[in-house]
C-alpha cells in the first residue's frame, strides 16, 4: 500500500514537472514577397517553439507599435511547443525600419528582431 502511494506521488510530481519546462521562442521576420520600394507587401513574424503559451508579440515600424496587425490562432506542435504568425500589410521604402518585438517568460527583457529586406 505504502509503495503504491509513493509511486503515485512520484508520477504526479513528474507530470507536474512537465508543466514547468520553458522554451524560448524562435522569431522569424520576413516579407511575403521580395521587397520592392513603393510596392505593397505583407510583413510576417513567425514565432515558434515556445512554452508556456503566454506571449506578447508586436510588429514595429521605426520602433513604434503597428496597430493594424492580424494573427493566426495559437497552435501547438507535436512536442507541445506553441507557434503563431503575426502579419500586416505594409509598403516598404528605403527609410522605414520594421521589426518584431516579443515578450515571453524566458526573456528577461523583450527581444526585438529586425526585418532584413534582403531575406
From Swiss-Prot:
UniProt-listed PROSITE patterns: IG_LIKE (PS50835), IG_MHC (PS00290)
Main location: secreted
Gene Ontology cellular component terms for the protein in this record: extracellular region; MHC class I protein complex
Annotated keywords: Immunity, Immunoglobulin domain, MHC I, Secreted, Signal
Chain ranges of the Ig-like C1-type domain: 25-114
Family under the similarity heading: Belongs to the beta-2-microglobulin family.
Protein name listed in UniProt: Beta-2-microglobulin
Lineage: Eukaryota, Metazoa, Chordata, Craniata, Vertebrata
Gene name tied to this protein: B2M
Amino acid at each position: 500500500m505504502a509503495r503504491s502511494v509513493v509511486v503515485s506521488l512520484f508520477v504526479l510530481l513528474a507530470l507536474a514537472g512537465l508543466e514547468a519546462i520553458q522554451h524560448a521562442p524562435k522569431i522569424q521576420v520576413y516579407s511575403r514577397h521580395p521587397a520592392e520600394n513603393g510596392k505593397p507587401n505583407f510583413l510576417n513574424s513567425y514565432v515558434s517553439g515556445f512554452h508556456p503559451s503566454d506571449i506578447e508579440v508586436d510588429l514595429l515600424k521605426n520602433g513604434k507599435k503597428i496597430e493594424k496587425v492580424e494573427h493566426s490562432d495559437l497552435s501547438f506542435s507535436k512536442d507541445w511547443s506553441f507557434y503563431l504568425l503575426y502579419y500586416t500589410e505594409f509598403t516598404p521604402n528605403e527609410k522605414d525600419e520594421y521589426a518584431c518585438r516579443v515578450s515571453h517568460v524566458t526573456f528577461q527583457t523583450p527581444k526585438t528582431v529586425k526585418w532584413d529586406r534582403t531575406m
